[in-house]
């Protein structure tokens, strides 16, 4: 009888441990757990190795999984991306340009980003992408071609004849010195061919990520307001309260969707 009771206790303990590891069939796992090829949540190689569907997947050797299987791919799901771009009108040029796959491909060319990004950072980034492009409607700045973004005093990245350096891509890369520095970093001739940003969606997202890593990520720990200032400081201090409030609304929305707290210091 005592042996039977002991067996029952051990069995119940096993069930408790099992339920702690396997949260639900077909996944919906916590952020730190992998969804296995069979649709269960866990953290061992059986879950995070071969066939891993989402979460912090890794190859059988213990390294991060290929594009789409790592943390950035598990956060920026197709459903999350579609929830944004589907709000753009049917006639928007960006609707047939920007894709979730092009973002993931671009992100994986920045391993320091792809392997360390958090849900709050994605909420921050896509709030700005949404605002800058109108839910991925616009590839280029409205009336941008009529505006002069050539700093003739910048001799390191001189303007090419007949080329315009107006806003393009998800972060609206602007000015010759930004096109020049970005192109140099990405090994692309963006100074001579700025139109590459508006003709190749992966290049477009790569330019956004370049600007992000150099100008925005360093201030993330200061709050969302600091990222607004990094992208368009003219909106701050009452410069354009409507734009600031719109960015904050998007940010709060995406934090809610991704299950993270927005944190303090949202405005600038």
UniProtKB/Swiss-Prot annotation:
Signal peptide span: 1-24
Record carries keyword Signal: yes
Superkingdom classification of source: Eukaryota
One of the Pfam families matching this protein, by short name: Glyco_hydro_19
Cysteine disulfide links: 27-35, 29-41, 34-48, 52-57, 92-137, 150-159, 236-268
EC number: 3.2.1.14
Domain Chitin-binding type-1: 25-59
InterPro entries hit by this protein: Chitin-bd_1, Chitin-binding_1_CS, Endochitinase-like_sf, Glyco_hydro_19, Glyco_hydro_19_cat, Lysozyme-like_dom_sf
Location of the active site: 132
Sugar-modified residues: 265
Keyword flag Transmembrane: no
Family, per entry: Belongs to the glycosyl hydrolase 19 family. Chitinase class I subfamily.
Free-text function comment from the UniProt entry: Defense against chitin-containing fungal pathogens.
Record's protein name: Basic endochitinase CHB4
């Amino acid at each position: 009888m005592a042996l039977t009771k002991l067996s029952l206790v051990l069995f119940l303990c096993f069930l408790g441990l099992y339920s702690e590891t396997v949260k639900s069939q077909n996944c919906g796992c916590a952020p730190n757990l992998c969804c296995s090829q069979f649709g269960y949540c866990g953290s061992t190689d059986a879950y995070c190795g071969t066939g891993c569907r989402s979460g912090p997947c890794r190859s059988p050797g213990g390294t991060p999984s290929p594009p789409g299987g790592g943390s950035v791919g598990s956060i920026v799901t197709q459903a999350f991306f579609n929830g944004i771009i589907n709000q753009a009108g049917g006639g928007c040029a960006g609707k047939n340009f920007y894709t979730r796959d092009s973002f993931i491909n671009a992100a994986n060319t920045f391993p320091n980003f792809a392997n360390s990004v958090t849900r709050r950072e994605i909420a921050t980034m896509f709030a700005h992408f949404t605002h800058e492009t109108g839910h991925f409607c616009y590839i280029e700045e409205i009336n941008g071609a009529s505006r002069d973004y050539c700093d003739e005093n910048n001799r390191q990245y001189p303007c090419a004849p007949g080329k315009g350096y107006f806003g393009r891509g998800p972060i609206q890369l602007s000015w010759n010195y930004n096109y020049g520095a970005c192109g140099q970093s990405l090994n692309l001739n963006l100074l001579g061919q700025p139109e590459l940003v508006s003709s190749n969606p992966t290049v477009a997202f790569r330019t956004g990520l370049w600007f992000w890593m150099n100008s925005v990520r360093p201030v993330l720990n200061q709050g969302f307001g600091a990222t607004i200032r990094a992208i368009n400081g003219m909106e701050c201090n009452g410069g354009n309260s409507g734009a600031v409030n719109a960015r904050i609304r998007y940010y709060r929305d995406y934090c809610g969707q991704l299950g993270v707290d927005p944190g303090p210091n949202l405005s600038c």
